[in-house]
């Protein structure tokens, strides 16, 4: 149940908030929001949220980004 709520929040962000930005800003593939969905789906709410937050903290101008899939 909580997993579905988290994924719904991320999907809401992807559909309504992310398009407001002028250009895509995520430095990674898959995007941080897609990574979060995959992490929560694969590892559950606690570990998935932890992995997603860790990934979001890496998404800044001083990190090179690149291909970073869920392991």
Curated annotation (Swiss-Prot):
Function description: Could be involved in insertion of integral membrane proteins into the membrane.
NCBIfam families xrefs: membrane protein insertion efficiency factor YidD
UniProt similarity note: Belongs to the UPF0161 family.
Keywords noted in UniProt: Cell membrane, Membrane
KW Membrane (keyword) present: yes
Protein name from the UniProt record: Putative membrane protein insertion efficiency factor
S-S bridge residues: none
Keyword Cell membrane found: yes
Membrane protein topology class: Peripheral membrane protein
InterPro entries per UniProt: Membr_insert_effic_factor_YidD (IPR002696)
A single cellular component GO annotation: plasma membrane
UniProt-listed Pfam families: YidD
HAMAP family hit by this protein: UPF0161_YidD
